[in-house]
């Protein structure tokens, strides 16, 4: 229904003694708003999104600083799996052949009410009209018609797939099995703007990468 939360990931770690790749590397990706650049923040990992001196991650927020490999380890433990990119988009469209731009409709906001945790303003001048500069509790902005939350904004979400060009696309994409697809967009600025939060928005990252705006959700085969 929702992205995996900090509390859920903690249960996994406490049960298995799992160490994330961010913990093994000793750092993870955080954007420094003051310096306006990405940094490998020492001590940043799923419990400390902004490094050792920062606040603890909140239990009901989506877990972040997890790589694709970490996400797969969790899903294997939980008896689930990562969704394929096609499954993710099908779910974002509530299982319909919907023409809506976003999982909830066609507008990011209406009469001052935001439908997702998304970036507003320029990179140098962030605005917090939706109430959250960084992650928000899962489900804060409600469900789509399929009963799923956070299918646009809050955190990018790992998919099972290697990132590939769509059939018929002329985009010069070199397939690399270590580069995986991410969906949903996040709370953070994206060069593609609103399109990153759309049901068709997509991006990619290497399977070892962990960032302060990337998490995951689980899928299961129907019985």
Where are these regions (language model features)?
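Short, structured beta-strand segments at or near domain termini in extracellular proteins/domains
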Residues: 212-223
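Functional-site microenvironments in short loops/helix caps that host divalent-cation chemistry
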Residues: 19, 24-200, 207, 212
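Short, structured active-site-proximal loop/turn typified by the sulfatase FGly-forming signature C/S-X-P-X-R
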Residues: 13-19
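Short, solvent-exposed alpha-helical surface patches in non-cytosolic proteins
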Residues: 1-13, 67-73, 89
